[in-house]
C-alpha cells in the first residue's frame, strides 16, 4: 500500500486570551495515496502548513510520533 508520511503544522483550535497568542500543533500521520489531495485541502483549510511529505509504507491513519 502506498502512503505518504505527512508532517504538518496547524494552529490550535482553542482560543487563548488574545487573538495574538496562537499555539501551533505539529503532527505526523500516514495518509493513503488516494486520500492525499483531500488531506492536503483539510490542512490548508484549517490555516495550516505542510512541513514535510515522504513516501512510506504502513497502516493508514496511524500516528507516527513514535517511529
UniProtKB/Swiss-Prot annotation:
Compartments, as annotated in UniProt: Cellular thylakoid membrane
Q: How does it sit in the membrane?
A: Peripheral membrane protein
- What InterPro entries has UniProt attached to this entry? Allophyco_linker, Allophyco_linker_chain, CpcD-like_dom
Intrachain S-S bonds: none
Q: Sorted alphabetically, which Pfam families does this protein's record hold?
A: CpcD
Taxonomically, the superkingdom here is Bacteria
Return one Gene Ontology term, BP aspect: photosynthesis
**Which keywords are on file for this protein?**
Antenna complex, Membrane, Photosynthesis, Phycobilisome, Thylakoid
GO CC terms = phycobilisome; plasma membrane-derived thylakoid membrane
According to the entry, every stretch annotated as the CpcD-like domain falls at 1-56
Task: Name the family.
Answer: Belongs to the phycobilisome linker protein family.
**What is the documented function of this protein?**
Rod linker protein, associated with allophycocyanin. Linker polypeptides determine the state of aggregation and the location of the disk-shaped phycobiliprotein units within the phycobilisome and modulate their spectroscopic properties in order to mediate a directed and optimal energy transfer.
Official protein name in the record: Phycobilisome 7.8 kDa linker polypeptide, allophycocyanin-associated, core
**What high-level taxonomic lineage is stated for the organism?**
Bacteria, Bacillati, Cyanobacteriota, Cyanophyceae, Oscillatoriophycideae
Protein encoded by which gene: apcC
